[in-house]
Amino acid sequence: MKLYMTTMSGNSFKVRVLASILDIPIEEVHIDWDNREHKSPAFLDRNPRGQVPVMDIEGRTFWDSTAHLVYLARTHGGEDWLPSDPLDMAEVMQWMSFAQDEVQFGLMWARGVTIYGRRPESFQGYLDDSHTALELLTWQLRKTGDWLALGRPTLAEIACYPYVK
């Protein structure tokens, strides 16, 4: 199993965190982001979106960190990280969607402005979205205690963690 990634990518980080917790060996293939390797023809053959992470599993390529987390959890984590009960799964998945929406389009993009200087004209919007994301996380944790879903660690925490930490 190969993970095409960068160390600065929160989406790459969340996959690496779960793989580490589950003691899954992954070959990390570091992509040279600064030299735009992610836009090279060879990389675009793996992911036409030109983004990391990309995971190669037995010759099949998947280019979304949520897909990676689901695969790792279902193949190596039993019921612990992503339960098969439909209601429990829905509770976890809503927070995984939240991570790919409010967290990503707020906290991740605000981080991109502050660290990389990307799209500084949009910073206030990203900051506003970040506040909304943090307010929703705070609201949920006030209700549930230490965990976003099911009263225990799940993929919900792994999905949100990189940009909230």
Q: Where in the sequence are the language-model features?
A:
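Short clusters of hydrophobic/aromatic residues that line enzyme substrate/ligand-binding pockets
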Residues: 43, 80-82, 147-148
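Short, polar/flexible loop-turn hinges at active-site or ligand-entry regions and domain interfaces
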Residues: 76-85, 116-123
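N-terminal G-site of the GST-like fold
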Residues: 1-66, 89, 121-125
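A basic- and aromatic-enriched beta-loop-alpha substructure that forms the phosphate/nucleotide-
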Residues: 66-74
